């Protein structure tokens, strides 16, 4: 580079800005003497070297072949990137014309032969003459036939309805496809797969493009649907086959070049770079030829990095190269090649300059290290990374690359030479000069920055990056047609070998730096272009199918975020290309969305570094997303929803949607949903179809466009109405749409349950169940139940209770026959989006909401959190007398619980057979044995209870109480009645049990006895069943429940109880008191009349009575407090006294002197003796 050109550039550090020190070691390495350099003065040597500058080593012819191969491949990739997904004959013809011109140029040497020579030189392996000649001959034939096909395609384009043009293009297509099928094996000859690899890749690319035409034009050519499908399936099969072959043999060739020396690394990296450009970049585009997946223009991006050769002088005559004494292969690989990382771009550079000198007239200032500044897509944060050394510097140089693409660099790798003494020389390799050619990303203006600290008397070699990464051939200047931009700069540094060599990393220009989503095109954003990655998320290297690195998410917390710009208002779908070793769920959040997607396992039993083409699949977010035009950044986060071993994200795709497309999609979805309801004969419902699914299908039909599809909508509505009729007809539940809760037939429910009209989750009416009610210290569950009578059931048949839960906490669901089935549902309220979609008028868009609900339901798993439920229940032998039927019930026992549910149905699933029938028959036998025991137990307790009740009466009509009946007889009978089991259902006490009738019969008779007893006792409320009613008491007196008996408690000596009541004059009465005294002192019950005639009964603790122990059976339900034993201590006594009076009023007073006084009953009854 001439210093006379400095006025054209911005020169940085043409002279040192600071001067710190020279290198401390002047001659770290002295070379062994050579014949050429012994006794030679350095000035003579410099003169000898002058004029022999060679930019690149090796044969010029070979280098030109390599450059031509790379340039042709870059041109092809550029043409392919601009023509992806364009399904029109004009652009396709134009693309084919350009590809043919590149691959079969009108020059003497074959481009295919250049491809062969390129790889031969890279791996130092010649293709056998027979294989080369055969391949070149067949490629020539393919070129001729491709031209004929292109001609036929152009003629058909001009005359699409002409029979000859149509026949010719179809024939030429079939012939060319047959030739590719026949000739492709010639491009992968055994033992020559690697040197043939570029040829194979380019031929495979042409074949796949050809097969794509069958999908694009096949219908217009008159091909049958099955023929088109066959071509499409072949294209998909060959895409995988060709891709896997290319990647496999690329990796094989690269692995063979691994070595131990720096020179071997140079060869290794050159193979990696050039084969990425000629093979992997082409393979990465194969997936985009799938017209069913990519029917529109598609923007694809290549995010892989390639590294140009390290910037050190090489092959200096009689001196050598920088890599002759340099770090090892593995050290250079580690230092120069970045590990997989989030895609970034360079924004600034600080170069650290050191000086190596021999004399004041012979020295080199060189690039000794640097700090690079870079950003991730869409972020404002700047990251920095240090390379090389920043110690003992001469100067620092700062470069600002903000908003610029560096499309080219010119660098000087130099050597500084000194003859230490005759026969010994000292050489130092460094990089003293670089020019950065830049173009502004915003306004296309150009600028050049130069790093050039002063050096003197050095031998330099110019390195032009465009010779390794040429621009596309477009007729435009290179600042417009450049193919790559500088992305990063690494460094090979070793103080021990005195190695200071920068390495430039480049990214393809197709990698957009803003993640702009274009309107009207499918925009692909590679996973590596995420702005941030979360915990348990990392970047892994792609194998070549993907054009760049991948994002790997693991466990529940793995996540990544993308930042994008939408310059125009758009409507689109989101699709993800991925690979995973298990089936699970991911969540999407952003763009006013929050949803979950289920993904299926795509591979197993292999490492993520061994993935093949078919290990990658697609999942699609079902909702159409709308965004408004904005220059602001929009965010989309993707995370793992469940514990997942590995989810590998290749790319996200934004697929534009117009109203017609969305309407067509809605119609197809509605058709699919409605058809799925019916059997093949369309005269019945599919066995597994639920009432909720019928309603959801109806919602989809309602959302169809009346303008575009009026007839289809009408017909689908007729079908879904029939499905609803069939669903209702098979449902054995009464009042399934909750018209009358607690009516004569149907549902019985607790208070507080609401009936809600339909919404986006429920089309029809549904119920909202509140939590259990708390009143004082008691908790009253919320319940809902219904009985299906025995008469509508079939023997030995399985039925199923089904329904849908919008959300719930602690909802218990039961089916009850001879046994009880119970499930508990805790269902999250996650079916509706956080931000409701709205129409242009601001109202909620119910159809969009409905799609969101459907998408959520498609990915939910079958667990306690699932919204749908299904409980089987089997019938055996029917007993119409017992009429057990089937009870269905819902209950919430937690005050904090809640539930919304609807679409309840009990349907017949089918007759039992096989193991299920055998199992039920065994259970039925066990049930009969159990029922026999229950009946025996019932008979015993019922007879004891009935006898106790019979003894209460003096007649058979239960009209007169036995005169000797005391309150203890009544309570004893009551306890026996309460001990009768199976009166109510164990889970729902409101549901009658097998002994409900007997229990009710005895309870009614006992209630009659209590009534007669109350009539007989002249003292109102003498048994305290009505608490303190009728009694005058002081504040400390209370009534307690002891042994299921109401007991009056006088706790202190200063408390009193009294009552005035009416009696019949001149009638003899007996005062009978049942009480006990605790502690010291006495308890008194006194009675007097208007004439102050009185009687007193005295109770003390010494009235101990061993008969004071009671055996009570207090429950009438299974498992509730049965056979409990109570003891009242120290004594319970019953004392009587006779009294009569001429007055019609009497007074009774109760008191005590100390301790506590318990009174169970005070009776004043007519003395019948």
From Swiss-Prot:
Pfam families in the record: Cry1Ac_D5 (PF17997), Cry1Ac_dom-VII (PF21463), Endotoxin_C (PF03944), Endotoxin_M (PF00555), Endotoxin_N (PF03945)
GO molecular function, one term: toxin activity
Keyword Kinase on entry: no
SUPFAM superfamilies in the cross-refs: delta-Endotoxin (insectocide), middle domain, delta-Endotoxin (insectocide), N-terminal domain, Galactose-binding domain-like
Listed name of the protein: Pesticidal crystal protein Cry8Ba
Chain's gene name: cry8Ba
Lineage: Bacteria, Bacillati, Bacillota, Bacilli, Bacillales
Family (UniProt): Belongs to the delta endotoxin family.
Comp. bias intervals (Polar residues): 15-25
UniProt source species: Bacillus thuringiensis serovar kumamotoensis
Region entry Disordered, spans: 1-26
């Amino acid at each position: 580079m001439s210093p006379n050109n400095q006025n054209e550039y911005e020169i940085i550090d043409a002279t040192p800005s600071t001067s710190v020190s020279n290198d401390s070691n002047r001659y770290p390495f002295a070379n062994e003497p050579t014949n050429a350099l012994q006794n030679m003065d350095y000035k003579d040597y410099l003169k000898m070297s002058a004029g022999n500058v060679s930019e690149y080593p090796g044969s010029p012819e070979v280098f030109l072949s390599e450059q031509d191969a790379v340039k042709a491949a870059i041109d092809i990739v550029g043409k392919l990137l601009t023509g992806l997904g364009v399904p029109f004959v004009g652009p396709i013809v134009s693309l084919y014309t350009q590809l043919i011109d590149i691959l079969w140029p009108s020059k003497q040497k074959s481009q295919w032969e250049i491809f062969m020579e390129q790889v031969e030189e890279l791996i130092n392996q010649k293709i056998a003459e027979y294989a080369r000649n055969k391949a070149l001959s067949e490629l020539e034939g393919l070129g001729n036939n491709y031209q004929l096909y292109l001609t036929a395609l152009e003629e058909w384009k001009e005359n699409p309805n002409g029979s000859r043009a149509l026949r010719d293009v179809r024939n030429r297509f079939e012939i060319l496809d047959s030739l590719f099928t026949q000739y492709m094996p010639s491009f992968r000859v055994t033992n020559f797969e690697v040197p043939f690899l570029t040829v194979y890749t380019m031929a495979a690319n042409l074949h796949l493009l050809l097969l794509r035409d069958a999908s694009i034009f096949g219908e217009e050519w008159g091909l049958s649907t099955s023929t088109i499908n066959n071509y499409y399936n072949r294209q998909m099969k060959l895409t995988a086959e060709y891709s896997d072959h290319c990647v496999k043999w690329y990796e094989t060739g690269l692995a063979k070049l691994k070595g131990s020396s720096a020179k071997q690394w140079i060869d290794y990296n050159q193979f990696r770079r050039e084969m990425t450009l000629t093979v992997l970049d082409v393979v990465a585009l194969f997936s985009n030829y799938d017209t069913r997946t990519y029917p529109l223009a598609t923007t694809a991006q290549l995010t892989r990095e390639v590294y140009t050769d390290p910037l050190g002088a090489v092959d200096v005559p009689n001196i050598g190269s920088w890599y002759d004494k340099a770090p090892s292969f593995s050290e250079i690989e580690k230092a120069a090649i970045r590990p997989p990382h989030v895609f970034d771009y360079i924004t600034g550079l600080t170069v650290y300059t050191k000086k190596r000198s021999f004399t004041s007239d012979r020295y080199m200032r060189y690039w000794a290290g640097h700090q690079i500044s870079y950003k991730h897509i869409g972020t404002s944060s700047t990251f920095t990374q240090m390379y090389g050394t920043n110690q003992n510097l001469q100067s620092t140089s700062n470069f600002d690359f903000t908003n610029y693409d560096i499309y080219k660099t010119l660098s000087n790798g130099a050597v500084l030479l000194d003859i230490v003494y005759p026969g010994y020389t000292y050489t130092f390799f460094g990089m003293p000069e670089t020019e950065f050619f830049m173009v502004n990303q915003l306004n296309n203006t150009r600028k050049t920055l130069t790093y050039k600290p002063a050096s003197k008397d050095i031998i330099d070699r110019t390195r032009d990056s465009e010779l390794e990464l040429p621009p596309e051939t477009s007729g435009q200047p290179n600042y417009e047609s450049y193919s790559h931009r500088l992305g990063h700069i690494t460094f090979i540094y070793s103080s021990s070998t005195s190695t200071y060599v920068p390495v430039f990393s480049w990214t393809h220009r197709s990698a957009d730096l803003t993640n702009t989503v274009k309107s009207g095109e499918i925009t692909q954003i590679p996973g590596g272009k995420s702005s941030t990655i979360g915990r348990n998320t990392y970047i892994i290297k792609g194998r070549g199918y993907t054009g760049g690195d991948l994002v790997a998410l693991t466990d529940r917390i793995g996540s990544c975020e993308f930042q994008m710009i939408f310059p125009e208002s758009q409507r689109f779908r989101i699709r993800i290309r991925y690979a995973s070793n298990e089936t699970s769920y991911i969540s999407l959040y952003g763009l006013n969305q929050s949803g979950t997607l289920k993904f299926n396992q795509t591979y197993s039993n292999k490492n993520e570094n061994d993935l093949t083409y078919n290990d990658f699949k697609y999942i699609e977010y079902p909702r159409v997303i709308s965004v408004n035009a904005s220059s602001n950044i929009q965010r989309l986060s993707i995370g793992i929803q469940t514990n997942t071993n590995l989810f590998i994200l290749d790319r996200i795709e934004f697929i534009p949607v117009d109203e017609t497309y969305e309407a067509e999609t809605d119609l197809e979805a509605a058709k699919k949903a409605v058809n799925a309801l019916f059997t093949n004969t369309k005269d019945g419902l599919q066995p597994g179809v639920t009432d909720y699914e019928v309603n959801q299908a109806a919602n989809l039909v309602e959302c169809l466009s009346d303008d575009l599809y009026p007839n289809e909508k009408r017909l689908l509505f007729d079908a879904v109405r029939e499905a609803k009729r069939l669903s209702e007809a098979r449902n054995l539940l009464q009042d399934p749409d909750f018209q009358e809760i607690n009516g004569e037939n149907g549902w019985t429910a607790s208070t507080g349950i609401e009936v809600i009209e339909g919404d986006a989750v429920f089309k029809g009416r549904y119920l909202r169940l509140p939590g259990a009610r708390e009143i004082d210290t008691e908790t009253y569950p919320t319940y809902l139940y219904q009985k299906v009578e025995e008469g509508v059931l079939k023997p030995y048949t399985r039925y199923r209770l089904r329904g849908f839960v919008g959300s719930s906490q602690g909802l218990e669901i039961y089916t009850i026959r001879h046994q009880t089935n119970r499930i508990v549902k805790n269902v999250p309220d996650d079916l509706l989006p956080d931000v409701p979609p709205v129409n242009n008028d601001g109202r909620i868009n119910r159809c969009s909401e409905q799609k969101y609900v459907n998408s959520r339901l498609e990915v939910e798993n079958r667990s306690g959190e699932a919204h749908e439920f299904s409980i089987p229940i089997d019938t055996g032998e029917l007993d119409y007398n017992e009429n057990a039927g089937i009870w269905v019930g819902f209950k919430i026992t937690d005050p904090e619980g809640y539930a919304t549910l609807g679409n309840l149905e009990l349907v017949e699933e089918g007759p039992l057979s096989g193991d299920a029938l055998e199992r039920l028959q065994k259970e039925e036998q066990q049930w009969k044995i159990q029922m026999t025991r229950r009946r025996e137990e019932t008979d015993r307790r019922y007879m004891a209870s009935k006898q106790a009740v019979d003894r209460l009466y003096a007649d058979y009509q239960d009209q007169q109480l036995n005169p000797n009946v005391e309150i203890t007889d009544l309570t004893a009978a009551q306890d026996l009645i309460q001990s009768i089991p199976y009166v109510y259902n164990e889970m729902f006490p409101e549901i009658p049990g097998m002994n409900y009738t007997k229990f009710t019969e005895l309870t009614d008779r006992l209630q009659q006895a209590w009534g007669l007893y109350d009539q007989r006792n002249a003292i109102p409320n003498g048994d305290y069943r009505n608490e303190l009613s009728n009694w005058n008491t002081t504040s400390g007196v209370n009534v307690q429940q002891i042994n299921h008996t109401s007991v009056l408690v006088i706790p202190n000596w200063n408390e009193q109880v009294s009552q005035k009541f009416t009696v019949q004059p001149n009638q003899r009465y007996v005062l009978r008191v049942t009480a006990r005294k605790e502690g010291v002192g006495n308890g008194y019950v006194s009675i007097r009349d208007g004439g102050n005639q009185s009687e007193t009964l005295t109770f003390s603790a010494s009235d101990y009575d061993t008969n004071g122990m009671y055996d009570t059976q207090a429950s009438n339900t299974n498992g509730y407090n049965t056979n409990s034993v109570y003891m009242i201590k120290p004594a319970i006594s019953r004392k009587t006294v006779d009294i009569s009076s001429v007055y019609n009023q009497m007074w009774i007073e109760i008191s005590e002197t100390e301790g506590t006084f318990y009174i169970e009953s005070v009776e004043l009854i007519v003395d019948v003796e």
